[in-house]
Swiss-Prot record:
DUMP binds at residues 36, 41, 69, 72-73, 146. It comes from Mus musculus. This is Ribonuclease 4. Cleaves preferentially after uridine bases. Has antimicrobial activity against uropathogenic E.coli (UPEC). Probably contributes to urinary tract sterility. Its EC number is 3.1.27.-. Its main location: secreted. InterPro entries: RNaseA, RNaseA-like_dom_sf, RNaseA_AS, RNaseA_domain. Expressed in the cortical tubules of the kidney (at protein level). Also expressed in the medullary tubules of the kidney. Belongs to the pancreatic ribonuclease family.
Amino acid sequence: MMDLQRTQSLLLLLVLTLLGLGLVQPSYGQDRMYQRFLRQHVDPQATGGNDNYCNVMMQRRKMTSVQCKRFNTFIHEDIWNIRGICSTTNILCKNGQMNCHEGVVKVTDCRETGNSKAPNCRYRARTSTRRVVIACEGDPEVPVHFDR
C-alpha cells in the first residue's frame, strides 16, 4: 500500500513538473519574439527620416549583417500605444491565423535600393501615418510580428 502511494506521489510530481516546464517554454518564446519585434520595428524617439535614417537604423538594429533585409517598417509610437493595438478586434493574418490586429501609426518604411551588398546596405525611406497590422500573443497580449 505504501509503495502504491509513493508511486502515485512521484507520478503526480512528475506530471506537475512537466506541466510547469510546458508553461514556462511558451512564455520564454513569446518574450523572445516580443523583444525581436521591438528591435526590428519600434523607434519611439524618432519622427521618421530620410534615406540615411534607414541606412543607419537597419544596420544598428542588425538587419544587414548577413544579407540586406529587403523591406522593414519602423513604428514611431510609444510602446504602450503599440501594445494597445493588440486590444483591438482580431483580424486575419497573412498566414491564416486570427491573432492579428490593426491600428494607425506613424511609420518609416525602409526599402532596399536593390544595388547594395551586406553589410553596407542602402535604403530609400518613406515616412507616413498609415494602417499597420501586427500579430499579438500572450496574456496580456504583446506584439510579436509585423504582418503588414
